[in-house]
Amino acid sequence: MQVPFFMADGEEQEIIFRLGAGKDSNEASSIAKQFRGAQVAADALDKVKKYWEQTTGALQVETPDEAINIITNGWLTYHTLSSRLWGRSGFYQSGGAFGFRDQLQDVVSLLHTRPELARQQILLCASRQFKEGDVQHWWHPPVGRGVRTRISDDYLWLPFVTAYYVKHTADISVLDVSNNFLEGRLLNQGEESYFDLPIDSLKSATLYKHCVRAIKHGLNFGAHGLPLIGTGDWNDGFDKVGEHGKGESVWLAFFLYEILKSFAETASLHNDLKFSDTCKNEAKKLKTNIDENAWDGEWYKRAWFDDGTPLGPKSNGDCKIDSIAQSWSVLSGGGNESLVHTAMESAYKNLVQKDIGIIKLLEPAFDKSDINPGYIKGYV
């Protein structure tokens, strides 16, 4: 937008630009008329400023590092809302779709600033769950056309964030809000994903039952007693690790362990002691299987391929060590107390490069061996 104008020496002028959107030309015209005039524009701008001051000022920290203070006291919250929740865009993907896990994990950071937005996103995501328990990996509003996949962690973010929300807000009422399930065809054998518009099922359930269904859907384990990775976990690029239904994920084991622990408490609050006990028992078994199978001497493995080949052992030419398998051994409490310090020391030693200021996600990159974990190998 541009406006030509002339100014004399010492003269001041105020130019107001109005930018908005409507569903059609009539709505756009109506909105534009509401914001005519300098005072109306000034009031609208002041309202925006106050919104951001209240939102970003709700949580303040003070540390000896001014850079940390700046990024924490406002910038991260602003970025989460404007870019992640509203803009939904990035350098690699500028599609504007809602990602099931993406925006759920983002709203966790808003629990102390805009908890109502976290609640809203949780309920929105519950409405994108298929009746079988899996979910749309991503979808485009307003109609909801999106992709159904075999990715193994998406649906588990619903109980994870719900339990976290309830714990930090004490808003138990959200568990009783109902949402319909989605219905769509199941993935065919050998089919990794498909893009389609599902229909709203006539069947509905409370948020609590949506979460229970997600957890039950995730209790599928492989030969080592760890969760099946499917065609990717938190790392979508590992889409070939478990494409034939047998590959397992160590990171997902830690994540699921955390969910089982936290949702056991949520189930108790909801007076579902039977499912609370189920979560506790499954968590206990999972921790035993992690202890017996996932350790590789100095750090935790990352996964196993369908054929039983481990991903993340010291003997690998590629991805000898993966960051999130080490960090989540601590974050979840699922790692062996006598081993997690060694795991984190190994991560620091192998992944932190102070000279160039980066922390690698894994090391070495997938560029030496014939191992094909998926499209992560195509990133440059």
Segments (PLM) and residue ranges:
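Acidic, mature catalytic/reactive cores of soluble proteins
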Residues: 1-380
